[in-house]
A protein has these predicted regions:
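Conserved alpha/beta-domain cores
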Residues: 184, 229, 244, 252-254, ...
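Often metal-dependent polyanion-binding catalytic scaffolds in large enzymes
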Residues: 1-442, 460-463, 484
Length: 529
């Protein structure tokens, strides 16, 4: 279907000569694939060598679209196959499913309590990067998404003839415009564009898949280990390097890191606001028919005290009222975030009517869920609110945690300049590794500040210092959960880690005296011989 419509679009837009050329190349390629004929391959190469540049461009464009459509068709076929297997298997779990894995573990002697203990210590963090292999524009990806939806409707819906024709017309429209759409951008995207692109690419899928994944695990555990209480913690989260990986990329600065985190936060907050509004529409239980528990009553009362002029106090639907109050706090949090100007070294008093930590939102949602379950509303208590709780556990208030990465050489050069400028040490870079370790160990045990509040160093050194100060400011004023990992690339010695600890101490991220660290340092040993 897709190939036929694609061919018709080429025939209409580029003409019969172009269409025949593309079909000839396609058929010759298929023959080579089926026969592995070296002679046919040489004939094809000879044919391509004789084609003019403008026609080669047309060929490249045609086959680019063709392979995108072919990949889409293969994805649809795989989904169709999986759905068919699940329908035919009835109670039998699918191969490689969560349930199948748990059955295999049970049959090998693993007990439910062992699964419980494993889950409590599990921590799975898929990390997104701005991978150069995905250079397609958002416009192209949107067209493919639209085509996938159309194919789903043709496959799974019972359609009237007029509805089927409408879908076929929509497919033809998308492919016709796809053929004349630029597949890649004209200019290189900025870092913040890459952040936005990843959000646009994965956000819609993740917020649908994650709750389903949590439900699949819960269902499988209950079925495979009946009667055993196995708590499912938040063992899954997502990370990103985009906006945090500054190793070799001068465009990733402390300002870009701040902007990337803010964009991720704003995105997930807006999504939560939409979901809470939807939830309030579902939970329309009237107090004429139910009596809310004391914990919910107290929670509503506490929230009302945060909004003295609130006019929602007369609503006689307690769960909806609580959702409205959550909505207000989320919107206040979003406003606070948008107007926030980070200020390192200056104490900031956080507003009381915002969410700062994700557990605050989780507590509010759990109050509603627990009350629903205690009143016998098991479907509502285990329905949409449970999915939202799952999302908050996974994405918290930052969508993706951001890993900061910098090359070890940048830290060493910056520290050497600071030590010389402050009259502490003239020749830090000339010290051997053992001497550096001794010096840095002594420095970390001193209470004095090494770096003044006002920076007077080179641009590169100031950027290193500002990165750590930005991390500290974000943890204190914006989001305490988003930044936890600092990656040192090209690590070859232990002193590389101590250099980072010095900068972390100076920013307020680490202290030996007070026994705390707000970051986990991750050395990369790719430079070791």
């Amino acid at each position: 279907l897709l190939g036929e419509i694609h061919g018709n679009a080429i025939l209409k837009q580029a003409g019969k000569i172009a269409f025949d050329l593309i079909e000839e190349i396609k058929s010759k390629s298929l023959v080579i694939r089926e026969t592995n004929s070296l002679l046919e391959a040489r004939k094809l190469i000879s044919k391509l060598d004789g084609i003019e540049t403008k026609d080669l461009r047309l060929l490249i464009r045609a086959f680019g679209v063709y392979f995108d459509l072919l990949n889409l068709a293969e994805q649809q076929a795989r989904v169709r196959s999986l759905r068919k297997k699940e329908m035919l298997n009835n109670d039998e779990p699918l191969r490689e499913s969560v349930e199948a894995a748990l059955i295999e573990l049970r049959e090998s002697g693993v007990k439910g309590c062992e699964i419980h203990n494993l889950l409590q210590s599990a921590n799975i963090v898929p990390v997104f990067t701005a991978h150069p292999s995905e250079a397609r524009r958002r416009t192209v990806l949107d067209k493919l998404d639209c085509l996938a939806l159309c194919l789903d409707r043709l496959e799974y819906e019972i359609l009237l003839p007029s509805e089927k024709n409408e879908i076929l017309d929509s497919i033809a429209e998308q492919i016709e415009t796809f053929w004349v759409t630029k597949s890649v951008r004209d200019d290189k995207p900025k870092v913040i564009d890459e952040v936005r692109q990843v959000i646009e690419t994965v956000m819609d899928s993740l917020v649908k898949i994650v709750p389903r994944f949590c439900r699949d695990i819960d269902y499988a555990l209950t079925k495979v280990f009946p009667g055993e209480v196995i708590d499912i913690p938040a063992f899954l989260s997502f990370g990103s390097w985009i906006g945090g990986d500054r190793d070799g990329n001068p465009f990733v600065t402390h300002d870009v890191t701040e902007s990337a985190i803010k964009l991720n936060q704003e995105t997930i907050l807006k999504y939560y606001i939409k979901q809470v509004h939807f939830l309030g529409g579902i939970l329309s239980h009237a107090d004429l028919f139910i009596s809310p528990g004391q914990k919910l009553i107290d929670s509503i009362s506490n929230d009302k005290s945060l909004f003295p002029s609130d006019d929602s106090g007369n609503i006689n639907e307690p769960y909806r009222l609580k959702c409205l109050l959550i909505d207000k706090k989320l919107k206040n949090t979003l406003t606070y975030l948008k107007t926030l100007k980070l200020s390192w070294g200056s104490p900031v008093e956080l507003p009381k009517n915002i969410y700062f930590h994700s557990h605050q939102l989780l507590d509010d949602l759990k109050v509603i869920a627990d009350d629903l379950l205690s009143k016998g509303f098991s479907n509502a208590g285990n329905g949409s609110i449970r999915d939202l709780i799952c999302l908050v556990k996974v994405f918290k208030f930052h969508l993706f945690s951001l890993d900061i990465r910098q090359n070890s050489n940048r830290h060493g050069r910056a520290l050497a300049e600071i030590l010389k400028s402050e009259g502490v040490l003239e020749n830090y870079l000339q010290l051997d590794p053992t001497k550096k370790l001794e010096f840095l160990s002594e420095e970390l045990n001193k209470n004095r500040p090494l770096i003044p509040a006002r920076l007077k160093y080179s641009e590169d050194t100031c950027e290193v210092v500002k990165t750590f100060r930005t991390m500290a400011s974000i943890a204190e004023q914006q989001n305490p959960e988003v930044l936890s990992t600092y990656i040192i690339s090209s690590t070859t010695d232990a002193y590389h880690i101590l250099e980072v600890l010095v900068f972390a101490r100076e920013a307020g991220l680490f202290s030996i005296k007070d026994n705390y660290s707000l970051i986990d340092i991750v050395p990369l040993f790719e430079a070791l011989l």
